[in-house]
């Protein structure tokens, strides 16, 4: 039961395996092969099972299953096994039938029978052939082959038909084809009638000579060999030793270095003199330069070393190197060393480097030919010539790859030709010229109108000094247009300039130098080139546009074109401070200077209410030290006379006096014109004092780049600038300070208007000047009344020049703006 279940399981597994593999191995032209669901898929037709590439196994399953005695011949059809028939399939087929249920007829009958399953014929004796159709010809002493018909004779008979008897010893047999006797061992002769006498060794059948067995020798094989190894000669008994042994009896092994029969062969080049195999002669490893199993083959040409893995160097004419070491026997010219790897030393060349090189100026000689190989940039036999134009490199052998054909003789980099150099020069000069033109234009734009040659000081270096004044004045005018405030971070000490005049009021101004690059801490600098420190101190006061002088509004000269006074931008013209003697003679207001001090109104009064209207002017030195009393007495001419016949212009204060003395913001460079005057008009009985506050001193920070450029520009133009008279802008008449006291008392606007009417010069055409780094407020110059003042000016100009008397120029009366 278990066996049946096991067989059924195996059969099912086999069925599944065949079904799984049938789709991939079937032949489309095989038996019972059908197409599947797709054209490319093949499968067995229903009722058939795959076998190899066809479907030749029928399937009988279920109700159509066959019994044990039956086989399935077609799907669902069972028959008896071949050779049987009947209801139980137990009866054998008759001789003339074969196959399933004995349905096939046997063609061999009656001379043979068919095989039940295949139908092959089995012939009866004396018949042969495929269907047993041929009778045998062997007679009674032989049998024929059923396939071929050849006769097999019985012993003692021979011939093709087995009809001839043999003529041999009965114990022997004869050849069936020839009838020759074949003797058994120990017998010899034509009929095998003689016995051999060879001591158990066979003898030759035709001659009876003994053929000795191994270990025996002699004519009758009666002598035993004495060899330990190998075989002895059957005739002489000498031992034939096997490879690796030698001696009479082959009892000795081969000596080291030898191998083979009788140890007659020598070993090859085994490594470290190792012995080779005494039998074969093979080496475990070979010496360098040898190859092969027996190390008897040298390395192929071009190789050397162990196992011939090294490559030979380049020897002379390509000859092979030594197979063991790789050394060259000879080297090519220009090389040295065992492997010809070292070039000739400097100064030698040729075969074996035995020749001396010629002199090469810029290069080395060729190690082979001895010719000079020039360095880059040189050529010639001795390398003493530079490369011609258009070539570079070693021996000047490479042409230049440049548009103009010129290149560096060593590196080959392109160099500029005539056109390239011109383009480079133009490219450099054009920006420089543009920059220079910009600087010149900037300088002329900032310098304003040049001074008339007669207005320049006559001391040495005055042109350069006045040029610097123009530059600083232009910058200061730019700063004056800005509102009160700080433009930088310079901190300067306070300097107070007080003016005492009962007739002319002054505004109070906080003044700052236009440049931070003062050379010293002096309050007022002199011309650095003049050498005179105490004369002609120039000051500069930038005006404010909103400050309109009262005299200009009230005077009749205000109706003139442009007004009777210069415009605010012309009020910045520098003027020299007059000497005390000149002030006394001209009845000018006395001016006193105190450096480093600060005057403030006391007891609630403004600076215009100071005590005495009559003060002696003091001359200010560089160190702000007073002059000796004797000198002051000499220069002083007495008390000033105050003109009370005309009313002085009313001056109003634009701010609180207390605020006028407030500290400026730190580092201020702006002119902070915060005017400070008295609240009421100036009284005739008491003298009015106007105080001007100025910032002076050495800055705490270095000058900026803009100021440095302008300062250097002034130094450059010091010797370049020639005095030229500008005819386009006429200068107003210079008004010298009168020395007679009779000239005092006229109104400031009257004389000035007369002078302008006589010269027909507009006040706004008056040129502006610059101070030498210090700004000051202009004091009002009161011209003398009457027409004689103009004549006196022309007569006294020469006298004032000789005395180098400082003059006032383009003085604008400063008044407070009108009250709103």
UniProtKB/Swiss-Prot annotation:
GO terms for biological process: cell adhesion; dendrite development; neuron remodeling; positive regulation of axon regeneration; positive regulation of neuron projection development. Residues 631-648 have a biased composition (Acidic residues). Residues 444-820 are cytoplasmic. PROSITE patterns: EGF_1 (PS00022), EGF_2 (PS01186), EGF_3 (PS50026). Disulfide bonds join 60-72, 66-78, 80-89, 102-114, 108-121, 123-132, 166-174, 168-181, 183-192, 221-232, 225-239, 241-250. Residues 24-422 are extracellular. Residues 549-685, 715-820 are annotated as: Disordered. Residues 650-662 have a biased composition (Polar residues). GO terms for cellular component: plasma membrane. Glycans are attached at residue 291. SUPFAM superfamilies: Growth factor receptor domain. Its main location: membrane. InterPro entries: EGF-like_dom, Growth_fac_rcpt_cys_sf, LE_dom, MEGF10/SREC1/2-like. Keywords: Cell adhesion, Disulfide bond, EGF-like domain, Glycoprotein, Membrane, Phosphoprotein, Receptor, Repeat, Signal, Transmembrane, Transmembrane helix. Heterophilic interaction with SREC2 via its extracellular domain. The heterophilic interaction is suppressed by the presence of ligand such as Ac-LDL. Interacts with AVIL; the interaction occurs in embryonic dorsal root ganglions at 18 dpc and induces neurite-like outgrowth. Mediates the binding and degradation of acetylated low density lipoprotein (Ac-LDL). Mediates heterophilic interactions, suggesting a function as adhesion protein. Plays a role in the regulation of neurite-like outgrowth. This is Scavenger receptor class F member 1. It comes from Mus musculus.
């Amino acid at each position: 039961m278990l066996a049946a279940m096991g067989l059924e399981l195996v059969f099912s597994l086999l069925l599944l395996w065949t079904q799984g593999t049938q789709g991939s191995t079937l032949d489309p032209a095989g038996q019972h092969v059908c197409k599947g669901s797709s054209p490319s898929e093949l499968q067995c037709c229903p009722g058939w099972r795959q076998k190899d590439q066809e479907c030749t196994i029928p399937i009988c399953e279920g109700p159509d299953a066959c019994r044990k005695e039956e086989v399935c011949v077609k799907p669902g059809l069972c028959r008896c096994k071949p050779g049987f028939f009947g209801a139980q399939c137990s009866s054998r087929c008759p001789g003339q039938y074969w196959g399933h249920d004995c349905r096939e007829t046997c063609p061999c009958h009656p001379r043979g029978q068919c095989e039940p399953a295949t139908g092959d014929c089995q012939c009866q004796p004396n018949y042969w052939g495929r269907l047993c159709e041929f009778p045998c010809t062997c007679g009674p002493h032989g049998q024929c082959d059923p396939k071929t018909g050849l006769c097999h004779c019985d012993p003692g008979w021979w011939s093709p038909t087995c009809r001839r008897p043999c003529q041999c010893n009965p114990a022997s047999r004869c050849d069936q084809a020839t009838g020759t006797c074949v003797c058994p061992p120990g017998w010899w002769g034509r009929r095998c009638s003689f016995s051999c006498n060879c001591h158990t060794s066979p003898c030759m059948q035709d001659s009876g000579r003994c053929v000795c067995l191994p270990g025996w020798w002699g004519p009758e094989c009666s002598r035993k060999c004495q060899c330990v190894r190998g075989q002895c000669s059957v005739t002489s008994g000498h031992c034939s030793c096997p490879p690796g042994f030698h001696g009479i009896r082959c009892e000795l092994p081969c000596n080291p270095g030898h191998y083979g029969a009788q140890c007659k062969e020598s070993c090859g080049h085994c490594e470290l003199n190792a012995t080779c195999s005494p039998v074969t002669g093979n080496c475990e490893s070979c010496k360098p330069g040898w190859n092969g199993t027996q190390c008897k083959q040298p390395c192929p040409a071009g190789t050397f070393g162990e196992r011939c893995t090294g490559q030979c160097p380049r020897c002379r004419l390509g000859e092979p190197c030594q197979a063991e070491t790789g050394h060259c026997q000879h080297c090519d010219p220009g090389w040295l060393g065992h492997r010809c790897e070292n070039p000739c030393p400097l100064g030698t060349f040729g075969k074996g480097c035995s020749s001396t090189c010629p002199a090469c100026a810029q290069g080395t000689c060729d190690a082979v030919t001895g010719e000079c190989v020039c360095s880059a940039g040189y050529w010639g036999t001795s390398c003493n010539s530079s490369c011609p134009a258009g070539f570079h490199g070693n021996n000047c052998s490479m042409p230049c790859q440049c548009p103009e054909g010129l290149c560096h003789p060593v590196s080959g980099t392109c160099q500029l030709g005539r056109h390239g150099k011109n383009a480079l020069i133009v490219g450099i000069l054009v920006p420089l010229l543009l920059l220079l033109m910009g600087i010149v234009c900037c300088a002329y734009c900032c310098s304003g109108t040049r001074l008339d040659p007669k207005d320049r000081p006559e001391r040495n270096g005055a042109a350069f000094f006045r040029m610097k004044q123009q530059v600083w004045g232009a910058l200061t005018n730019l700063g004056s247009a800005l509102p009160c405030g700080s433009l930088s971070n310079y901190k300067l000490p306070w300097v107070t300039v007080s003016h005492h005049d009962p007739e002319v009021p002054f505004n109070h101004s906080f003044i700052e130098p236009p440049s931070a690059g003062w050379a010293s801490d002096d309050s007022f600098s002199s011309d650095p080139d003049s050498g005179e420190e105490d004369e002609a101190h120039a000051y500069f006061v930038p005006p404010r546009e909103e400050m309109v002088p009262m005299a200009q509004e009230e005077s009749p000269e205000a109706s003139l074109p442009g007004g009777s006074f210069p415009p605010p931008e012309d009020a910045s013209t520098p003027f020299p401070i007059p000497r005390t003697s000149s002030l006394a003679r001209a009845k000018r207001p006395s001016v006193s200077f105190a450096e480093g001090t600060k005057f403030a109104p006391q007891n609630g009064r403004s600076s215009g209410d100071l005590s005495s209207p009559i003060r002696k002017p003091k001359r200010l030195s560089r160190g702000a030290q007073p002059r000796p009393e004797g000198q002051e007495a000499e220069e002083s001419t007495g008390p000033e006379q105050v003109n009370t016949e005309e009313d002085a212009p009313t001056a109003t204060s634009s701010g609180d006096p207390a605020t006028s003395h407030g500290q400026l913001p730190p580092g201020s460079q702006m002119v902070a014109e915060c005017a400070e005057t008295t609240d009421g008009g100036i009284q005739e009985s008491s003298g009015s004092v106007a105080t001007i506050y100025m910032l002076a001193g050495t800055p705490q920070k270095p000058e900026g780049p803009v100021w440095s450029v302008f300062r250097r520009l002034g130094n450059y133009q010091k010797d370049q600038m020639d005095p030229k008279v500008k005819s386009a802008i006429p200068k107003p008449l210079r008004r010298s300070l009168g020395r007679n006291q009779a000239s005092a008392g006229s109104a400031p606007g009257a004389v000035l208007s007369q002078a302008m009417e006589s010269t027909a010069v507009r006040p706004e055409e008056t040129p502006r000047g610059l101070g030498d780094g210090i700004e000051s407020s202009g004091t009002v110059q009161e011209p003398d009344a009457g027409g004689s003042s103009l004549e006196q000016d022309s007569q006294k100009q020469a006298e004032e020049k000789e005395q180098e008397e400082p003059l006032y120029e383009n003085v604008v009366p400063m008044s407070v703006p009108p009250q709103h």
